[in-house]
Design a protein with these regions (language model features):
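Periplasmic c-type cytochrome electron-transfer domains
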Residues: 1-152
Length: 152
C-alpha cells in the first residue's frame, strides 16, 4: 500500500516505482525487453502513479466499509471480533489518508477519510454508540469514495 517498494525497499514512493519501469535499468533487462520497453514522459509517470494511488485508496475504502458494516448493524458476535474489525478498518482508513496525501491528491476526499477515522477511533474506544459511530464512519467513507469517482 505504501512505500518503500520492491524486494529491497529501494524505492520510497509509487511515483519512483513507476519511474523505475520507465528507466534504462528496467528497459534493458530481459523483462523490459520482453515487453518491448516502456517509454513514458514525466507527466505520464505522475498520472499512472496517481491512478494507482486512487485505485489503492478505493480498495482500502471497500475493505473498511466491509469491516464496519457488521459493527454498524450489530451482527458481530464477539467483542474481540468487533475490536479486531474496527482496528483493521482504522488501519485501512489511515493508509488511505497516507496514500492520497503522499501524492497531494483529492484533498476533499482526505478530509472525509480523516472524519471517518475519527468516528472509527471513537467506535474503537467506546461501547454505547459504537454502531452509530461505525455508521457515521461508513457515510464519510462513502463520501470519500464518491469524491474519488467523480468524473470531471
Amino acid at each position: 500500500d505504501t512505500g518503500p517498494f520492491f524486494h529491497n525497499n529501494a524505492i520510497e514512493t509509487i511515483e519512483g516505482a513507476v519511474a523505475f519501469f520507465n528507466g534504462a535499468a528496467f528497459n534493458s533487462s530481459p523483462s523490459g525487453q520482453a515487453v518491448g520497453g516502456i517509454i513514458l514522459d514525466g507527466t505520464q509517470v505522475v498520472e499512472i502513479a496517481a491512478f494507482l494511488r486512487v485505485i489503492n485508496t478505493l480498495e482500502n475504502i471497500r475493505q473498511s466499509i466491509d469491516l464496519l458494516e457488521p459493527v454498524a448493524r450489530k451482527t458481530v458476535s464477539t467483542v474481540d471480533q468487533i475490536k479486531r474489525w474496527i482496528g483493521q478498518a482504522a488501519q485501512e482508513t489511515q493508509d488511505s489518508i497516507q496514500v492520497l496525501s503522499g501524492g497531494g491528491l483529492h484533498p476533499q476526499a482526505v478530509r472525509y477519510l480523516e472524519e471517518a477515522l475519527k468516528q472509527i477511533q471513537k467506535a474503537e474506544h467506546g461501547i454505547l454508540f459504537r454502531g452509530k459511530q461505525a455508521l457515521e464512519a461508513i457515510k464519510q467513507l462513502e463520501k470519500a469514495r464518491a469524491e474519488l469517482l467523480e468524473i470531471s
